[in-house]
Structure formats: structure tokens, C-alpha cells
């Protein structure tokens, strides 16, 4: 039974997911349904957490919009997610960047990772 489940999950995995780490700035394009129309909506933010669970993998992005912090969790292999692109690579030393929630302004900046 578990072989069948693994095979089905393997078929549903997306192949075009770029590699990214916490601290990186990503732009995620998501399909949004408004009435009878479908359109792409972009969300750009810093990766503050990654959850690696195969088909159930997810990552959390954070951005500050009009002075308000906005966090959004995306399922990596969801059909709602159209594309993921890495805009900037960040140099951090932790896997979870929840400390950015209490910071604002210059203290919330992340250094850029060079040499990769």
C-alpha cells in the first residue's frame, strides 16, 4: 500500500522548484480566482522558515507592506503556486528567522550571500 502512495506522491511533485534557503528573497506567483476570472498574483518576501516533507513541503515568506508585516505560508508543490523565483540570496545563520517579527527598519535587514 505504501508503495502506491509513494508513487502517486512522486508523480505530483513539481520538478521546476529552485533551491532556496532561509534568508533568501523569493517572488512567488500564485493563481487567484476572482469571480469567474483567474489571474496571477505576485508575492515577494524573505524566507523565514522551510518545512521539508516531500509532497507536503512548505515555506513561509515575510514582507512589510505599508508598515504592516505580512506572512504567508506556501505549499511548495501546490497547483495554486505557478512559479517561484529567487531574487536575492541572504546570508543567515539560523534555520528559522522568527526573530525578524520583532524587528523593523535597518535591524531587519539581511546581508547578501556572495560567492554562489
Swiss-Prot record:
UniProt keyword annotation of Ribonucleoprotein present: yes
Gene3D superfamilies: 2.30.30.790
The entry's keywords: Ribonucleoprotein, Ribosomal protein
MF terms in GO: structural constituent of ribosome
Superkingdom of the organism of origin: Bacteria
One term under GO cellular component: cytosolic large ribosomal subunit
GO terms classed as biological process: translation
NCBIfam families registered for this protein in UniProt: rplS_bact
Family named by the database record: Belongs to the bacterial ribosomal protein bL19 family.
Function: This protein is located at the 30S-50S ribosomal subunit interface and may play a role in the structure and function of the aminoacyl-tRNA binding site.
Name this protein carries in UniProt: Large ribosomal subunit protein bL19
Organism lineage string: Bacteria, Pseudomonadati, Pseudomonadota, Gammaproteobacteria, Pasteurellales
Gene: rplS
Amino acid at each position: 500500500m505504501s508503495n502506491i502512495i509513494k508513487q502517486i506522491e512522486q508523480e505530483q511533485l513539481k520538478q521546476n522548484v529552485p533551491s532556496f534557503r532561509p534568508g533568501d528573497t523569493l517572488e512567488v506567483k500564485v493563481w487567484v480566482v476572482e469571480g469567474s476570472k483567474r489571474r496571477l498574483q505576485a508575492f515577494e518576501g524573505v524566507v523565514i522558515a522551510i518545512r521539508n516533507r516531500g509532497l507536503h513541503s512548505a515555506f513561509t515568506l515575510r514582507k512589510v507592506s505599508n508598515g504592516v508585516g505580512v506572512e504567508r505560508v506556501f505549499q511548495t508543490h501546490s497547483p495554486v503556486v505557478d512559479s517561484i523565483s529567487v531574487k536575492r540570496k541572504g546570508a543567515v545563520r539560523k534555520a528559522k528567522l522568527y526573530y525578524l517579527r520583532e524587528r523593523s527598519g535597518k535591524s531587519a535587514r539581511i546581508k547578501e550571500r556572495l560567492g554562489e
